[in-house]
Amino acid sequence: MKDKRILSRFGIVILVLLALVLIFPSAKIDLASSIEASTQASVRVEHIQNFARSAEMDVQLLSADDPAYQQIANVLSGLTCVKRFNQQYSSYSHEYPVDSVTVSYYDDTENNNLLFTVYSDGTAIVNSQFVKVKAPKGGAEEVYRELAEIVK
């Protein structure tokens, strides 16, 4: 009887570990392959005064041969983004005012391949999913500074 209990507990532990192994590797988002599959991008730089109003907005359309496109692609391709499972839009708010840079990548048929938004307060969102950003020079705040410098 004792052996069956041990086997049962061991089986449950194995199932939990298997579930974790299946969940966590899929938490990483591959930005580089989405960027490589794209031929154009749009970049939106925003200064947001409060929840209801953007004070300033600048939108640029970039083709793959544009130097700014290449610089942005180099910055984003070097990032590691991991999904945050515990953060939802409804429970998140910024300290206003806040600035943001949003990059949308598209293929030849104008299908959206990637939507990346980073805020000056260090928040990052990829394809409507909050992410933790790891960059060679820091986190999301540093990525925001790099992208804002490229598009200004």
Task: Give the location of each predicted region.
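Function-determining sites in protein domains
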Residues: 2-152
